[in-house]
Structure formats: structure tokens, C-alpha cells
From Swiss-Prot:
It is found in: Mitochondrion inner membrane. InterPro entries: NADH_DH_su5_C (IPR010934), NADHpl_OxRdtase_5_subgr (IPR018393), ND/Mrp_TM (IPR001750), NU5C-like (IPR003945), Proton_antipo_N (IPR001516). One of its GO terms (cellular component) is mitochondrial inner membrane. It is a multi-pass membrane protein. It catalyses: a ubiquinone + NADH + 5 H(+)(in) = a ubiquinol + NAD(+) + 4 H(+)(out). Its EC number is 7.1.1.2. This is NADH-ubiquinone oxidoreductase chain 5.
């Protein structure tokens, strides 16, 4: 069985890499890289179903080592693949979502002169993501980790003629680099103390070690890659990239790499209370903070981006609850509806002449009925509406949190964030779809394109049934709570309904007139993103510059003027003045010096 899984994975890699290899031909004529890439990904998806079906039937996990990369007397680095439920379920989902997004990009990017290069970047990113997911050692995982990082940088800055896109790409790579420090330090610790990067050997050898330091490094790595509080500002500004990039990298695949890293190494984390509490509190804070920022945003893509960050916080909370399988379930369900929300946003933006302000939309249900329907389904799935995909993971997470007897503050923050999810989702639907049109009547609105409708339809099916299918075939590692009061059981649903009521009120508060600054003072915190970018990107550099300038001024004035040249000059001038008096023809001075010299000369003779 392992052989079939391994052969399937190699076939997937070959299918995906083949379009990349064809671009190496310097004499290629009229290449259809975009179409070939979409076909390759769809073929790879169907191939990936074979090992998944075998796994669901036999429930056998496998590890296979292909090639010894580097061998020393004490340290081995091998190419090793791991076929467990995490990799075998995530790879088909990643391929399915990517297939839909690439097909959408054929329509969205059709006028771009470099569309072939764009598809090449997306395909390279997908290969790096599959390497990361299937890796059985830290070195291989690191290759995939850095691969998705550099492709993120290239794709966010795709429209490099715009200063905002370049700034966003740099911001993303710098914040991720801070997180990468944590992963590199952890790998260095493992290499020095355990002499191995193989995941199974790490689990076996680390039982007698205090793993707090490497686990904190992993938490830092996940904070950077998965946009947790502190290293989160890069995710909303990454929306400067094309919408297919936002849908693929910044919703469904790359941003969950940090959470996936913690899931993969969770057996070493489950007994370390400091690491678990850190993840729990960090996730709860991220979830609430980013949900608060989304409440009064008016850019459609930024609202969806903040919701991604909020859901990543919820996944981090689940890691802190010692429930990695629930975090993985939320990763899988979240991929479908979040990618669909981005594609619907892209379709709306494209149809309204690149307009992203939700105050200039409205009434789209009559003009774009299919897109509006799917957009509403995605928003309902995001809020955890019963029996859509998001419900199966979100409800289970809230129940696990309610019955965990852990940090009550984390529980409170997460419940408030869940309520806020409903607020910004329904506010988005209200402004974009309902009401009367508030855009120019000349917009060329046409959604009757199979490249648009079919892709969003595929993801809509996933948003409806993925949760049910995965939960039926993916048994939980721990027995769920069987006895629970009706209040706790209905907690997630109640806060969602409360959020709906608040959303209606917030929609009335938000002025539909486009104003540069908000008129309502309560909106300032949310509109200014909690003042975090202002403090980190403006205040701290300003303080550093001011401090540096004052230090330079003091150094310049004190050492280079007062003590240095000027001080020396004043000393020399005093001495020069004394000697200068000697040469002015003053008889008294001459006689005094003569007598003084005579006395000094006769003293030794007299003695």
C-alpha cells in the first residue's frame, strides 16, 4: 500500500513539474503555459484521490525514504515522505482548490502580458506546499516552508509598477523572516541535542529533554507564517496582489503552513503547558483583534483577509486546547469557503471596473445572481451556519473550548471573536448584495463566463458538503464530550445570532457616503487597525530616528567640537597667548624672565 501511495505522490510531482520543465526550452513557440498548468493540476487532483481512497479503506499510514541526501557519522539527512491522514487529506484539498483558482485566473488575468509566468509562479508555489505537507523531516519541511515564502513575495508584488504592491511584498517577506528565525533556531537546537531532523526520531529521542525552547521557536515560526498577533500586519496588506493569489496563498494554503507545522510536531507539544498556553492565548488574542479590525473596513478584500487571520487565530486556539485534529479539520473546511469568498470578490471587483469599496456596491443580487448566491453561501459557512462546511469544525472547536476547563479569558475572547465573525460577514453581504446599486451604471457587468461560474460552483459544493464528508471519514483522536448542557451546546449558534443582530445595527451606523475619515469616534480603533501599524511602522522608526539624531548631535557637538578640536584649540590659544606676550617688546617682561633665569641658574651653584 505504501508503494501505491509513494508512486502516486511521485506521479503528482511529475505532472506538476512537467509544465515548469517545458518553459526551460529557449525556442518554444506560442506556449500555452496557463492552460497546461490548469490541466496538470486537475490531473494531479484525480491521481491524489487514489492514495486517499486506499487510506480511508485500510487506515494504514506509511513512511518511505527514497534517497540519502547527506550522511555523516552522527547525522543523516534523507528525502523522506510521510503518508498519514494529514498529508493524504490535505494534498487533494490543496489540488482541488488550486485547480478552481487557476481556472478562475485564466479569466481574471487574461489581459496580463505575463500570464504564463504568473501561472508558473502559482505552480511552483503549489509544488513547494506539497513538499511541506508530505515532508517527514525538518530539512525537507524547511525547503517547502521557504519555497512558499519566496513565491508569496513574488506573487504579492506581481504588479511591481505600483509602490503599494512592492511595499506589501517586502512587508510580507520581512515579517515571515522574523518567524523563520524561530524555525531555524529550533532546527539548530534539534541538530545539536538530538542529532536528527527525522520527525519520528525527534519524538522518540526528545522524551528526556526540556522542549520549551524549541517549542517556543516553533510557536514564533507559526506566528510569522500564519499571521498571529504581533506579526499579523502583512496579511491584510498582501491583498495588493492579484485576487487569485489572495485566494490561493492567503486563504487556503500558505497561511495555514504555520498551523500545519504545529500539528505535525504536536506530540512533543501536548505535554508542555507553557507552549499550549502560549498558543491558546495568542490564538484568542489574534482572533478577537483581527475580527475587530474587520468590523468597519470598507475594502472587500481586506475584510475577507482579516477574517482569514481571525480563523487562523481560532486554529491556534485549537492547538492550545490539545486538539490538533480539530485544527486540521478547520484548515480543510476553511480552504473551500475562504477561497470561494475571494473568487466571488474578484468577480465582483472585475465587473465593477476594479472597485473594491463596498460602499460603492449594492444591489448585486439582481445583476450577478450566481456570484451573489455563492458569496452568501461562503459567508454563511464562515459564520458557522448549521450543516455547512464551517459548522462541523467551528462548532466542534467551540464545544471543545467550552468543556476544556482551561483559560476562561481565552474562551471569552474566542466567543466574542466568533460573534464578530457573524457581524462583519453579514455586514459584507448587506453592503455588497442587498439594497440598491450605488455604482456607476456604465460598469460592464457580465458573470456568464464558464471560467468564473464553474470554478466558484465547484468551491460552493465543497463549502456545503466538505465538512460532512471529512467528519464521516476522519474520526477524532479523542472522544468528544457526550454530556453537555444545552447552553454550552448552543453557545456558538447563539453568539452567531447575536452577531447578526449587531451587524444590522452596524450597517445602519456606517455612512454610505464615501468619507476619508470616519465620523463615528467608536470606529477609529477598528479603522486604524488597532493603531498597530502606526505604532510599529511609524512610531518606533520615528523614535529611533529621533534618538539617533540626538545621539549624533551630542556626539558632534560634545566630542567633535567642545572636547575635540575646540577644546584643544582653547588650550593651545591660552599657551600661545603666554608665549605671544614674550615677543611684544615689553622691557619689564624681558627683565623678569632674565632675573628668573639668573636665579634658576645660580641656585645649583650655591647649593
Amino acid at each position: 500500500m505504501t508503494l501505491i501511495m509513494h508512486s502516486s505522490l511521485l506521479l503528482i510531482f511529475f505532472i506538476l513539474v512537467y509544465p515548469l520543465l517545458t518553459t526551460l526550452n529557449p525556442n518554444q513557440q506560442d506556449s500555452n503555459m496557463a492552460g497546461m498548468t490548469k490541466t496538470a493540476v486537475s490531473s494531479a487532483f484525480f491521481v491524489s484521490l487514489l492514495p486517499l481512497m486506499i487510506f480511508l479503506n485500510l487506515k494504514t499510514e506509511g513512511i518511505i525514504t527514497n534517497w540519502q541526501w547527506m550522511n555523516t557519522q552522527a547525522f543523516d539527512v534523507n528525502i523522506s515522505f510521510k503518508f498519514d491522514h494529514y498529508s493524504l487529506i490535505f494534498v487533494p484539498i490543496a489540488l482541488y482548490v488550486t485547480w478552481s483558482i487557476l481556472e478562475f485566473a485564466l479569466w481574471y488575468m487574461h489581459s496580463d502580458p505575463n500570464i504564463d509566468r504568473f501561472f508558473k509562479y502559482l505552480l511552483t508555489f503549489l509544488v513547494a506546499m506539497i513538499i511541506l505537507v508530505t515532508a517527514n523531516n525538518m530539512f525537507q519541511l524547511f525547503i517547502g516552508w521557504e519555497g512558499v515564502g519566496i513565491m508569496s513575495f513574488l506573487l504579492i508584488g506581481w504588479w511591481h509598477g505600483r509602490a503599494d504592491a512592492n511595499t506589501a511584498a517586502l512587508q510580507a517577506v520581512i515579517y515571515n523572516r522574523v518567524g523563520d528565525i524561530g524555525l531555524i533556531m529550533t532546527m539548530a537546537w534539534l541538530a545539536m541535542n538530538l542529532n536528527s531532523w527525522e520527525i519520528q526520531q525527534i519524538f522518540a529521542l526528545s522524551k528526556n529533554f526540556d522542549m520549551t525552547i524549541p517549542l517556543m521557536g516553533l510557536a514564533l515560526a507559526a506566528t510569522g507564517k500564519s499571521a498571529q498577533f504581533g506579526l499579523h500586519p502583512w496579511l491584510p496588506v498582501a491583498m495588493e496582489g492579484p485576487t487569485p493569489v489572495s485566494a490561493l496563498l492567503h486563504s487556503s494554503t500558505m497561511v495555514v503552513a504555520g498551523i500545519f507545522l504545529l500539528i505535525r510536531l504536536h506530540p512533543r507539544m501536548e505535554n508542555n503547558q507553557l507552549a499550549l498556553t502560549t498558543c491558546l492565548c495568542l490564538g484568542a488574542l489574534t482572533s478577537l483583534f483581527t475580527a475587530t479590525c474587520a468590523l468597519t473596513q470598507n475594502d472587500i478584500k481586506k475584510i475577507v483577509a482579516f477574517s482569514t487571520s481571525s480563523q487562523l487565530g481560532l486554529m491556534m486556539v485549537t492547538i492550545g486546547l490539545n486538539q490538533p485534529q480539530l485544527a486540521f479539520l478547520h484548515i480543510c473546511t476553511h480552504a473551500f469557503f475562504k477561497a470561494m469568498l475571494f473568487l466571488c470578490s474578484g468577480s465582483i471587483i472585475h465587473s465593477l471596473n476594479d472597485e473594491q469599496d463596498i460602499r460603492k456596491m449594492g444591489g448585486l443580487f439582481n445583476i450577478m445572481p450566481a456570484t451573489s448566491t455563492y458569496f452568501t453561501i461562503g459567508s454563511l459557512a464562515l459564520t458557522g451556519t448549521p450543516f455547512l462546511a464551517g459548522f462541523f469544525s467551528k462548532d466542534a472547536i467551540i464545544e471543545a473550548l467550552n468543556t476544556s476547563y482551561l483559560n476562561a479569558w481565552a474562551l471569552t475572547l474566542t466567543l466574542i471573536a466568533t460573534s464578530f465573525t457573524a457581524v462583519y460577514s453579514f455586514r459584507l453581504v448587506y453592503f455588497v448584495i442587498m439594497g440598491t446599486p450605488r455604482f456607476l451604471p456604465l460598469s460592464p457587468i457580465n458573470e456568464n463566463n464558464p471560467l468564473v461560474i464553474n470554478t466558484i460552483k465547484r468551491l460552493a459544493w465543497g463549502s456545503i458538503i466538505a465538512g460532512l464528508i471529512i467528519t464521516q471519514n476522519f474520526p477524532p483522536m479523542k472522544t468528544p464530550i457526550m454530556t453537555m448542557s444545552i447552553t454550552l451546546k448552543m453557545a456558538a449558534l447563539m453568539v452567531t445570532i447575536a452577531g447578526l443582530l449587531v451587524a444590522m445595527e452596524l450597517a445602519n451606523l456606517t455612512s454610505k457616503q464615501v468619507k476619508i475619515t470616519p465620523m463615528i469616534s467608536t470606529h477609529h480603533f477598528s479603522n486604524m487597525l488597532g493603531f498597530y501599524p502606526m505604532i510599529i511602522h511609524r512610531l518606533i522608526p520615528k523614535l529611533k530616528l529621533t534618538l539617533g539624531q540626538s545621539a549624533a548631535t551630542q556626539l558632534d557637538k560634545t566630542w567633535l567640537e567642545t572636547v575635540g578640536p575646540k577644546g584643544l584649540a582653547l588650550t593651545q590659544m591660552a599657551m600661545a597667548k603666554i608665549t605671544n606676550d614674550i615677543t611684544r617688546g615689553m622691557i619689564k617682561t624681558y627683565l623678569t624672565i632674565f632675573l628668573l633665569t639668573l636665579i634658576l641658574a645660580t641656585i645649583p651653584v650655591l647649593l
